[in-house]
Regions:
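Non-catalytic, solvent-exposed segments at the cell envelope interface
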Residues: 2-14, 36, 40-42, 46-350
Length: 350
């Protein structure tokens, strides 16, 4: 029996492993040598066929796709730029419009800081509040003029109700130690004096103020395209009016000049000022109904825009539009109440 030394086995094993590795290398080399020509041939065929990822055709296609994407991006960016410019212009335009209208409404000669301090807002935004409405005989540029018509309005936006109380312009009041007609208070102390005088007379706290002169009333009426009212009786006055001297009874649309005649004429009636005050309330009621019947906040905004130069008030543009919008749907036949302060005429000092 013979034996093989251990180191001989290791050598044999190493020899065997070495042989296997050599064989594997030879096989791999042979395979590589055998496939190299095929790979080269295939690559050559692809290039010649124009399908290589680096071919001119594909490069041109890629370039065209990039140009299309770039053009789309440029179009989108251009549109966004246009929209942004339009938006900015619109915002600026609205801002200028708002400031212009606001400046016309809040005439600083009338709406003074003293007046704003006298006006008193309601305790809660939902509470009813009082507005003093004046029709004046003032002319553009004048600062001293009288109140020709005086109406205290109670506005209840939540319940969509308005109450208008006419105060006779000849009502006697004690003002700063002297007795005078209430309409003369405006001549001496302007809007602020009138608000204080009416507060004391009626025991209220007025929240807002608005006035319009004769020309303004006619202008507002024309801006609305006329106002439809029911003229209850024939009226004629040729001594105090020239443009319009008479109106016949019946439902009719009054233009500016006719509206001025309807709301100012008094010598044609036996009770003089009382009928005139009733006509004034009737006209304002009809005007409110006509404005609210549009049912459109945009239309209300347009009306504010077209009449701002004819009205003076402490209210802002947004306040007026908001109030008008709140009152849309109001039943103007039932929910606008009108009355006048009971009084009797007395001749004083001759």
């Amino acid at each position: 029996m013979s034996t093989t030394p251990k180191h001989a086995k290791l050598l044999d094993s190493g020899a065997t492993q070495g042989t296997s590795a050599d064989a594997a290398q030879n096989t791999a080399a042979g395979s590589a040598q055998g496939t190299a020509p095929s790979v080269a041939a295939n690559a050559s065929q692809k290039i010649s066929a124009g399908t290589s990822p680096f071919s001119r055709t594909q490069a041109e296609g890629y370039h065209k796709r990039r140009k299309r994407v770039f053009r789309k991006q440029m179009v989108v960016r251009s549109l966004l730029g246009v929209f942004a410019a339009v938006f900015v212009a619109a915002v600026v335009g609205v801002g200028i419009w708002y400031a212009n209208v606001q400046a016309q409404l809040n005439n600083s000669q009338v709406i003074t800081n003293e007046l704003r301090q006298t006006l008193q807002e309601p305790s809660a935004p939902s509470d009813p509040y009082y507005v003093l409405l004046l029709g004046t005989d003032g002319r553009p540029g004048e600062t001293e003029y009288r109140a020709d018509s005086i109406i205290l309005a109670r506005v209840d936006p939540i319940h969509k109700r308005v109450t208008m109380l006419s105060i006779p312009r000849d009502t006697r009041v004690l003002w700063k130690g002297s007795y005078m007609k209430i309409n003369a208070v405006h001549y001496y102390d302007g809007a602020n004096g009138m608000v204080q005088a009416v507060n004391e007379l009626c025991g209220v706290h007025i929240a807002h103020y608005a006035e319009v002169n004769f020309d303004g009333l006619a202008g507002i009426t024309d801006a609305l395209g006329g106002v439809t009212v029911n003229v209850e009786q024939y009226m004629r006055d040729t001594e105090n009016f020239s443009d319009v001297v008479e109106l016949y009874p019946g439902v009719q649309k009054l233009n500016g000049a006719q509206a001025l005649f309807f709301t100012r004429v008094r010598y044609a009636f036996a009770d003089s000022d009382y009928t005139r005050m009733r006509h004034q309330r009737t006209f304002i009621k009809a005007m409110i109904a006509q404005i609210l019947n549009t049912g459109d906040p945009v239309a209300i905004a347009n009306i504010v825009n077209s009449t701002a130069s004819m009205v003076i008030t402490d209210l802002s543009v947004s306040d007026i539009i908001s109030l008008g919008t709140q009152m849309i749907g109001m039943n103007t036949d039932k929910d606008i109440y009108t009355a006048y302060v009971p009084s009797e005429g007395t001749e004083i000092d001759g």
